[in-house]
A protein has these predicted regions:
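C-terminal membrane-cytosol helix-exit motif in multi-pass small-molecule transporters
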Residues: 32-53, 252-257
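Extracytoplasmic gate region of multi-pass secondary transporters
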Residues: 72-126, 184, 189, 219-220
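A late C-terminal transmembrane helix in Major Facilitator Superfamily
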Residues: 195-231
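Glycine-rich segments within core transmembrane alpha-helices of 12-TM secondary carriers
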Residues: 1-15, 209-219
Length: 287
């Protein structure tokens, strides 16, 4: 909500001031004041939690990391999350796509960009989370989001770049924002489906984060280079690569669902939970 409100205020400032450079200056001053106020407020509002940092806590264990990676389904979940994040980051380029390919009005592009980045999250996250709970399978919901995202990406590629069709393209951008944000909001949830023991769950989540957020290392440099070299023709390439990531993500999720069915069916889950309960009970008895 905060991002949407601040973003709309920024867009309003830019739209209200005729000189773009002055508008940006005023916007930056506004943001600086907001950050300064929040910084001062945090000193008084954020409590000091005693013992928040445990100096005796066990450090990173390579053995646990290897065990987490070897756990059935973890690799598929990690690569799927990598693809989810890659497609999610690719949605950033739908804003310049509207500007450069459709010559869309700047204010329209700003509003659509804000809705895609912030506003859609108010709906997509809860809706997709509800679906995942209803179906009892985040992986299936993410798979569906991938399929819808691929369909929209194909629409971006084949849609004629007619300025009169800017509103239709903007609608596709919002739909794409919904599917990508929705998938991203539950992107790490498949870990809960593969019944990772709690003693290594944190390590597995860390591995997922390292692999999943890796697109940040290269994707913007890559796509930016394509735009510099090819101009508006680059968007066909960018959306093509986004489709590639989506297809790879679908394959990984299908393999993950097969792994879940093979290793973590109802009977297997019961046995795993019984074994873990026995292990915990044995540890408590020893203590």
């Amino acid at each position: 909500v905060t991002g949407l409100v601040i973003g709309l205020i920024n867009a309003g400032i830019i739209a209200a001031i005729a000189n773009v450079a002055q508008g940006v200056q005023v916007m930056l001053i506004f943001l600086a004041v907001v950050i300064a106020v929040l910084g001062v407020a945090s000193i008084f509002l954020i409590p000091d939690f005693k013992g928040e940092i445990d100096k005796n806590a066990k450090l990173f264990s390579l053995k646990e990391a290897v065990e987490a990676i070897k756990h059935p389904g973890v690799i598929w979940a990690c690569v799927a999350y990598f693809c989810v994040y890659a497609v999610y980051q690719g949605a950033t380029y739908t804003t310049p796509y509207l500007t450069q390919c459709f010559n869309a009005d700047g204010n329209l592009v700003n509003v659509v960009g804000l809705i895609r980045t912030y506003g859609i999250g108010l709906i997509a996250g809860p809706v997709v989370g509800w679906l995942a709970t209803k179906l009892k399978s985040p992986s299936k919901v993410i798979l569906g989001a991938f399929i819808l995202s691929i369909a929209v990406l194909l629409g971006f590629i084949v849609f004629p770049h007619d300025p009169g069709a800017a509103m239709v393209a903007a609608t596709l951008v919002v739909v794409f924002g919904f599917t990508t944000y929705g998938a991203f909001s539950i992107g790490s949830s498949p870990l809960s489906e593969i019944k990772i023991p709690m003693r290594i769950f944190g390590t597995a989540a860390g591995v997922l984060s390292v692999v999943g957020f890796m697109p940040d290392v290269f994707i913007h440099t890559w796509y930016g280079g394509l735009i510099d070299a090819q101009g508006i023709d680059a968007y066909t390439s960018i959306f093509g690569f986004e489709i590639m990531f989506g297809v790879i993500g679908c394959v990984c999720l299908v393999m993950l669902l097969r792994t879940i069915k093979k290793h973590f069916g109802a009977e297997s889950v019961d046995k795993a939970e019984e074994a873990e309960a026995a292990e915990i009970a044995g540890g408590e008895a020893t203590i």
